[in-house]
Amino acid sequence: MNTKTVKSMAGIVLSQISLVALFPLCICYQTHQSTSSVASLSPQFYENSCPNAQAIVQSYVANAYFNDPRMAASILRLHFHDCFVNGCDASVLLDSSGTMESEKRSNANRDSARGFEVIDEIKSALENECPETVSCADLLALVARDSIVICGGPSWEVYLGRRDAREASLIGSMENIPSPESTLQTILTMFNFQGLDLTDLVALLGSHTIGNSRCIGFRQRLYNHTGNNDPDQTLNQDYASMLQQGCPISGNDQNLFNLDYVTPTKFDNYYYKNLVNFRGLLSSDEILFTQSIETMEMVKYYAENEGAFFEQFAKSMVKMGNISPLTGTDGEIRRICRRVNHDV
């Protein structure tokens, strides 16, 4: 199916769209809820109120991907950055308003978070189909899954029924999202704070098998990793030389580099294979193979067993997607994802 065809389908009755036509064949992993705090979430939440919701989302994700393959990683990243700040409540999508400062202004998001226009477009289509029904938080969970699938990764049932926050937390976004230079212990502490464990950490960082990083995100590894003008000794020298050609010691801050230089747009296990060969782009990636025997063994296992990685990734995505959801009468269903309803 070409891009023109997908565009023409976006506005028609999407309940008849075949998932096989839009997405590559994939393995769907069954996952299960395990805590009472998310018992009100269900894969069938919109079965009666908006039965075409998932087909609409899938169609628009496909269109966005065909227009810009980078978008898959970008909208997946929004879900991560949302869930790590006061739970999966779509607070990352809110623009600044009045005294509320947007999470988009944090170091983790400023000049790098993207895909907001795609979310706006999908939300508009959902509002036309089922007004004030599908939350922006659920939309982020769905686009994350569909972005993985369209890149060749695993699928899973997305539990739905989240509601949207009325507030953003710039401070939370500054404090709770790991940086490219974070130590393994710092990253693990942040994951543990969200109820995620070491297994989840290693699996979820595998999402870096797609996407990009700016030069500014890893330059220190190339030239001054220890603070003594020395490069990172855990970085393959040939790979480092290649990176230095496009990421000099100064300038070119915004130059983009693939997180996985072998299969940059395919969701597979090459992320782990690269780490084994000391060709992880970010310091916060390579440390999985260099700072802990336990994580090293997991990296080697996933490098050799893509199916095991896919299965654990799906489980960990469900677990992450269930972090502190607003349900029942908490929060609201935003009509526009960038603004709370009283500002619309």
UniProtKB/Swiss-Prot annotation:
Binding site for heme b: H208
GO biological process: cell wall polysaccharide catabolic process; hydrogen peroxide catabolic process; mucilage extrusion from seed coat; plant-type cell wall modification; response to oxidative stress
Predominant place of localization: secreted
Cofactor: heme b; Ca(2+)
Site residues (Transition state stabilizer), renumbered to this chain: R77
Glycosylation sites (chain numbering): N224
Record carries keyword Heme: yes
Family: Belongs to the peroxidase family. Classical plant (class III) peroxidase subfamily.
Function according to Swiss-Prot or TrEMBL: Removal of H(2)O(2), oxidation of toxic reductants, biosynthesis and degradation of lignin, suberization, auxin catabolism, response to environmental stresses such as wounding, pathogen attack and oxidative stress. These functions might be dependent on each isozyme/isoform in each plant tissue.
Note: There are 73 peroxidase genes in A.thaliana.
Protein name: Peroxidase 36
Lineage: Eukaryota, Viridiplantae, Streptophyta, Embryophyta, Tracheophyta
Gene: PER36
